[in-house]
Amino acid sequence: MKFACFLAVSGLSAGAALAADDLNWPQFRGPRGDGHTTSTGLPLRWSETENVKWQTPISGKAWASPVIWGRQVWLANATEDGTELSVVCVNRETGAIERDLKLFDVESPQFCHKFNSYASPTPVIEEGRLYVTFGAAGTACVDTATGAKL
C-alpha cells in the first residue's frame, strides 16, 4: 500500500506544477511517451512533508503509474490477492477520492509474483474516457464524468 500511495503523491507533486501544454498526463511516461515535460519549477526533492500538496491513503496494491486529465488523477488498483480489480479517481487539487470503481471480480486469479501486482499496466485517458487493462482478467472503458463502465 505504501508504494501505491507514494506513486500517487509523487506523480501528483509533479502533476500539480505541469505547464499548460502538459496539463494532461494521458499515458505512461506522459503526453509524448518519453517521460519529459516542458514544465519548469518542478520540485527536485520531496519527503513526507516537503513539496507535497496533499496525501491520500489508497488501499490495494498497484504498480501502474497515475494518469491525469484536467482535475482528475486516475489509478489502476487491485486487492493483494487479485480478486478485485478497480480504478480510483483522485481530485488533483484536494486529494479527495472522487471515485473508487470495482471493474472486475476475479474468482481464480492467475499467478502473480509477490513483487508484482495485479494492477501493473498504466491506464490511458482522453477527454471523457479512461481505458484500463488487467490482462486476462479484462479490459474496460470508463466514462470519466459518470463513472459508468462502457
PLM segments and residue spans:
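Bacterial N-terminal signal peptides
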Residues: 4-14
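Noncatalytic, solvent-exposed loop/strand surfaces
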Residues: 18-150
